[in-house]
């Protein structure tokens, strides 16, 4: 089997490494020559994962046509804000009747489209039944280190879901399939917003009680907006929901938690983002999530406060204080 991977960031590289480790021939699309040379000559992604050796069956190319055309499966892993542009570039080369697996997370700024909506808008209908979406608690470095990991595979087509599940499943990588595309996407996107809040709490020196509170109430917000969009509430108790939320809010490798932590320590958002080599999806997703909650008429207190902190300059300490001063209410999820 020959597989093309679109996106040479840490997660796309990790998924490519996993598939190559299984014995598949994998080619990774990179945008710069030095990265291509480093992967092909030294088996190292010098930009994103410089301390890890990649399998020999994983190669790289700058030629998008070479990466996509004639492949038996396509894995798409660009940042969500770049996804539309990438899909427009690749669709003339896309093979028909092969699985297309998205690992992007986020909600598009402006249009407020979920990743699945972007795919279905940009690609002809003949590709739609072959689309699937991978999400779950999975740091890239730990996948490459072969640490036992679980993820969700969501597709509206059961045949596609089961095929992708079988291709990705390995000794250290277990997959669960679900038809709930919306639930998997909402969980994978909004957990990054909550992780920003958890990082701020840690940066301010608050304890684990506060982090647990943010995770708990964050799951409430994720579930509320998911239900409004038609998701199955049980999805949010699975890998792409609670699993990914816990990892992203607590793990030191979490880019979104790191951004929040540094904000809590007093750095500006501009300083933080200019120093990072990877994309923290939660920053852009916060804006989309805030606008989506306003559009749907859903109260999302944590999301609203993170938005005010990122885009209106609100002091992080005031954010936490205002969350604690909110009106008392009954526990539960209602939309």
UniProtKB/Swiss-Prot annotation:
Primary location: cytoplasm
Binding residues annotated for sn-glycerol 3-phosphate, in chain numbering: 105, 136, 138, 191, 244, 254-256
Active-site residues from the entry: 191
GO cellular component, one term: cytosol
Superkingdom: Bacteria
GO biological process terms on file: carbohydrate metabolic process; glycerol-3-phosphate biosynthetic process; glycerol-3-phosphate catabolic process; glycerol-3-phosphate metabolic process; glycerophospholipid metabolic process; phospholipid biosynthetic process
One protein family per Pfam: NAD_Gly3P_dh_C
Catalysed reactions listed for this entry: sn-glycerol 3-phosphate + NAD(+) = dihydroxyacetone phosphate + NADH + H(+); sn-glycerol 3-phosphate + NADP(+) = dihydroxyacetone phosphate + NADPH + H(+)
SUPFAM superfamilies: 6-phosphogluconate dehydrogenase C-terminal domain-like, NAD(P)-binding Rossmann-fold domains
InterPro entries listed in its UniProt record: 6-PGluconate_DH-like_C_sf, 6PGD_dom2, G3P_DH_NAD-dep, G3P_DH_NAD-dep_C, G3P_DH_NAD-dep_N, NAD(P)-bd_dom_sf
Entry EC number(s): 1.1.1.94
Subcellular location field: Cytoplasm
GO MF annotations in UniProt: glycerol-3-phosphate dehydrogenase [NAD(P)+] activity; NAD binding
Entry keyword set: Cytoplasm, Lipid biosynthesis, Lipid metabolism, NAD, NADP, Nucleotide-binding, Oxidoreductase, Phospholipid biosynthesis, Phospholipid metabolism
Pathway: Membrane lipid metabolism; glycerophospholipid metabolism
Positions that bind NADPH: 10-11, 31, 105, 140, 255, 279, 281
NCBIfam families: PRK00094.1-2, PRK00094.1-3, PRK00094.1-4
Similarity annotation: Belongs to the NAD-dependent glycerol-3-phosphate dehydrogenase family.
Free-text function comment from the UniProt entry: Catalyzes the reduction of the glycolytic intermediate dihydroxyacetone phosphate (DHAP) to sn-glycerol 3-phosphate (G3P), the key precursor for phospholipid synthesis.
Protein name according to UniProt: Glycerol-3-phosphate dehydrogenase [NAD(P)+]
Provenance organism: Leptospira interrogans serogroup Icterohaemorrhagiae serovar Lai (strain 56601)
The encoding gene: gpsA
